[in-house]
């Protein structure tokens, strides 16, 4: 029986963004079930106008003899005309789009036209509460929604049940699924580092404790709070030990979307050894960085999932996180003696409410910090919580990890890896299986739209 063909709309899977990386992982993990065509997005794509058939290379990498993957590079995420062309040329069985729904308003404008022939699928993440009821029309435009975080699953279930408008239909069970990001355990894993790797970053300097931050230098990632938290931690150490700890940052030092980290360090971090990685790294190199670190930190005020800390735990390195968005899914939170599930979040909403949930039982591999919530907004996104932490509270958690032995930290990280591969469900295999199950359900249950739909007013 011929495989179904999926048209994927997302970042070019050859690129380095988080969306591109996840796209690549689930495409490679499901090429035995589906043929893939990607409208491969990038800003001012250098390959615009070309078509790339990656099938032979994918066959070598995966061992799937009939793997079929084709890319159409494009400037941005697309438009109505190119979708119509690809529907005619490639004749896919479904369209799957991935990232913030605000990028896809043009797609939702033609959803009725598309859904006369193929289902429209959405791999979805939403950063925070309150429930974004302004997304209701977007959800109505999709036949199936795969939710990347448990919080997103709860949000989507609740918003989808809002029936204010007569044309809105309540989602059927198959239409909303939990499809967590999965980390490739064959790439991110505990290893013995090559002798020269540490020297390539630190020279001959040896550190007793390395805190690692791997994020874009943008405002919501809170890089300055990380710097100030580390400085506060260092000031609490005896003077003779201050030179033996460092903050390793894998990011741009100056970014218009973030800040000038060099000036911040010069003015406010006189006691800190802050070192920036010297280059971009392959996935293997990123795994080296996680293994080099003692702890990885992410205290972003909005975070859909947080790939860096998830990769860190899979590599066996423990973490510090802000209890926000998808970062919660990496903690192994428990209530009433069981791990929280996606269905639990329909009622809970989010654990970011400090008054209700601070101190919730969690895995040994993480030290979570509960935020204070404020509400931000814009015209397209009228309201969303902004979950901020106090950098002084973060410094306390850094000290807690520091006071443990390296062996204790490593043991905690390895427990996290085992949990992710098991009950945590954050393995690559689970992402691909849940993605396939969702797609199969959509293909099986899809009912093409009629050309016209009659509404009685």
Locate predicted features.
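Nucleotide-activated donor-binding/catalytic signature segment of Leloir-type glycosyltransferases, i.e.
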Residues: 70, 258-280, 284
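A short, active-site helix/loop in glycosyltransferases that binds the activated sugar's phosphate group
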Residues: 132-176, 183-190
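Short hydrophobic beta-strand element within catalytic cores of glycosyltransferases
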Residues: 318-321, 338-341
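Conserved donor-binding/catalytic core segment of Leloir-type glycosyltransferases
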Residues: 8, 203-221, 227-230, 247
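C-terminal amphipathic helix plus adjacent low-complexity
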Residues: 352-457
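N-terminal subdomain of nucleotide-sugar transferases
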Residues: 1-56, 90, 456
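Aromatic "clamp/platform" in nucleotide-sugar-dependent glycosyltransferases that forms part
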Residues: 301
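Extended catalytic core of nucleotide-activated donor transferases of GT-like folds
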Residues: 8, 53-151
